[in-house]
Regions:
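A "functional boundary" signal
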Residues: 21-191
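Bacterial N-terminal signal peptides
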Residues: 9-18
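Bacterial N-terminal signal peptides that target proteins for export
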Residues: 1-10
Length: 191
């Protein structure tokens, strides 16, 4: 007994669903390794990322991931983020405007702008990052990070009441994230 499907559109839809469920994004192996190393061995992650000789052949998503990882590793090692500026611009174009990664790219872009003493743009980047992160209720680590940066930015402009408010919010989020290093930093900035 043969069953005929009268609508070829249904067949196409079923094929598309099957294929889309099986397709997975492949990540560059060095990026995966750098991600694993980042928290405990940021210096090794930075060296690994700097050893990637060319981004040619990487997908735009991998290039954007590379930008965020390199910025994070440079920041954790105390290096300037200025060399990451154009890569962060790429990441901002690749990630969806409501994605957590877009917010993280805005955070690091704000740090670049602050390093260049472009405080108005840095403030805008930080606020946009917080707006995006508000849709992610459990991202306490990144929220605390942004609030800490805002506190520093307000402090540089002698806006001490606003700086204090930001540091209090940073301490709150850092305590929820259970990230002692950030919590201690935010707490010392508050006092």
């Amino acid at each position: 007994m043969y069953v005929y499907i009268k609508q070829p559109g249904i067949v196409c839809l079923l094929c598309w669903l099957c294929l889309s469920c099986t397709l997975q994004r492949t990540e560059h192996p060095a990026l995966r390794q750098a991600g694993y190393l980042m928290e405990e061995h940021a210096d090794s992650a930075f060296s690994l990322l700097k050893s990637i000789s060319s981004l040619i052949g990487m997908t735009p998503e991998d290039k954007a991931d590379y930008a965020l990882l390199l910025a994070e590793a440079a920041d954790k090692n105390g290096y300037s983020l200025l060399p990451c500026d154009s890569l962060l611009n790429l990441a901002l174009h690749v990630y969806h405007e409501e994605a957590k990664e877009h917010a993280i790219a805005l955070l690091y872009k704000g740090k670049v702008q602050q390093e260049m003493e472009n405080y108005a743009d840095a403030l805008k980047s930080y606020r946009m990052a917080l707006e995006i992160l508000s849709a992610y209720p459990c991202e306490f680590y990144w929220k605390g990070f942004v609030y800490n940066m805002l506190g520093g930015l307000y402090g540089k402009q002698n806006l001490y009441a606003q700086a204090k408010d930001m540091y209090v919010k940073a301490c709150y989020n850092d305590s929820l994230a259970r990230h002692n290093r950030h919590f201690i930093s935010s707490l010392s900035n508050l006092g």
